Amino acid sequence: MKIKRDIVNKFKEWKDAAKHKPILLKGARQIGKTWAMEEFGKECFDYTAKFDFDRQKELLSAFTVSKEPARIIKELSLYSPVPLVPGKTLLIFDEIQECEEALNSLKYFCEEAPEWHIIAAGSLLGVAVKRRRMTVPVGKVQVMRMYPITFKEYLRASDIQTFNYVEQIEEPEKLSLIILDKLKSEYRRYMVSGGMPEAAVSMLENQGMQAVDDILQGILDLYELDFAKYADPREIPRIHALWRSLPAQLAKENRKFIYKVVKKGARSRDYEDALLWLEDAGMIYRVNAVSKPGMPLSAYEEADIFKVYASDCGLLRRLADLPGSIVIDQTANYTEFKGAMAENAVLQSLLPSYGSVPYYWSSEGKAEIEFLLQREDEIIPVEVKAENCVSGRSIVVYNERYHPKNRIRFSFLNLQRNSGMLACPSPLTEWAMKWLDK
């Protein structure tokens, strides 16, 4: 089974643009970057030439002989089983972090040979660039970020009829219970598998919970091997400890990140580099608090107050050793962590369309708004509730203080719009902004 990835549409827009720079594709390990690039090549080009700088060390010589694109292409043609023809061949530079000269060459292709279509990607690209002090040709590449499979992509593969029904909704009106139940059922399954392609496909093909867990555990094991391969040896124990503390951080009623949860007596200065490493690797998202919801939100960021979420809800579930059956069947003792999973899944759905990590707001422990989104000239408060539990005063406190024009509450209750409040089922997170002004 194939799961269509929306980023391929962005690649198509890039190809059709009058002018284009080489793409530098960023994203965590195992999210399907190589597959998406190759799929795009199959759909839109006569030929696809992939050069893997991790497996083909001999490719380095093609970039050390000359910086001229024409000469580089001539050298690369010796390693390509397909013709290299501008406009007809997609060039994929995979694992580009293993060849700094190839990364630098993107500047020259941008300036001197824009007729070539090049997408470069790499595992842990952000980490490698920092550690090896590599230079990214700023302004000469178009940076794109790829994320794990979203629920929208998952639903399109699992139930195309329900997907098409949702796509056609123009006004935020109540859904039939049949549609709502279908969405909730598929969403719970998605929260179990997450958006790592192999795990999501395993779930869609009904290979069983154990198969999904084995795949996710394999990815977690690979991530921890990456610590040893790419991190400073002095930081490896801290990265391990911080990463493994994530479930405990999110299981707290107040999900604010606390260093002492990582290790007794831990201080921020001891773990900041480890936290940055995990961010650069695309494994976590740091959601900072703001002192007040003012414009721009970045001006009110509180750097030392933040929450940390996993890049994928399936990986978070497996890291926490939470059985998938509990997520699907909603066992009674599944309480605080249910809220953490709900928030993580909503954040995961918001990021691809919103484009940047949001902020959050808290008022002396008395009220908290999970996410704040900045859209043009307004700040939109976003509440996330687990399942049908929507009680709480946080949004009331926020409304009384700041009087937002629009607000969103994600839960498992039905879709409706009422006096500036968009109540949206969590499975429909990616459609919410479309309905906000209706």
Model-derived segments and their meaning:
Residues A200-Q374:
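Accessory nucleic acid-recognition modules appended to NTPase machines
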Residues R55-G87:
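Short glycine-rich substrate-engagement loop in P-loop NTPases that contacts/grips substrate
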Residues A36, F40:
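Hydrophobic positions on the alpha1 helix immediately C-terminal to the Walker A/P-loop
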Residues I92, H117-S123, R145:
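Structural recognition of the conserved hydrophobic beta-strand(s) that form the central parallel beta-sheet
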Residues V129-A251:
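Interdomain motor-coupling "hinge/lid" segment immediately C-terminal to the ATP-binding subdomain
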Residues K33:
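Conserved lysine of the Walker
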Residues M1-D16:
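N-terminal pre-Walker A segment at the start of P-loop NTPase domains
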Residues L84-A102:
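Conserved P-loop NTPase "ATPase switch" module shared by AAA+ and STAND
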